[in-house]
Amino acid sequence: MFKRVMAVVAVSIALAAFAGGAAAQTWSAEQQEIWQFEQQQWKMAAAKDLSWIDTMVHPNMRYWETGDPMPRDKASLKHWSRFMSENSTVLNQEIFPIAATITGNIAVVQYHYMIASENYKKERETVTGRYTDVLIKENGRWMFIAWAGGDNKKD
């Protein structure tokens, strides 16, 4: 049974990666720009470089993670990102683009992710999830203004 579940997971991930890659190949230059922005944020977070919060997040940011009782703000993001950074390490991660829609100075980006991490007890875990991010372009640069999503429920 375990092998079957792992095979289904592997095929699902491969299909998601292929579908995302195919979609990204037809993206406009501006869509590719916001996808690079997303990738940069994930790289910085994995490297425990929390400067992304000050440079890539709008002061009026609101976000709602799965499992949280209510939306939170930039100060909460900074607080909990610091805690998570001190207590876990990303071993590997990958994000798969699904859609990117841009209207004027607003962009909506949707994607799926997979993360392998290790906590302070040296316990390893792999999770998958999804996000919808809302970006705003001010003074020529994109910033996160909202997002919703997070880890998929474990069965």
Regions found by a protein language model. Give the residues of each.
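Short, low-complexity N-terminal intrinsically disordered segments enriched in polar/charged residues
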Residues: 2, 19-60, 155
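Short beta-strand segments enriched in hydrophobic/aromatic residues
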Residues: 57, 113-115, 148-151
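Beta-strand elements of well-folded, non-transmembrane domains
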Residues: 115-119, 135
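A solvent-exposed, acidic/Ser-Thr-rich amphipathic alpha-helical stretch
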Residues: 32-35, 49-103, 112, 124-127
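A short acidic/glycine-rich loop-to-helix N-cap element
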Residues: 25, 120-126, 154-155
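Bacterial N-terminal signal peptides
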Residues: 8-17
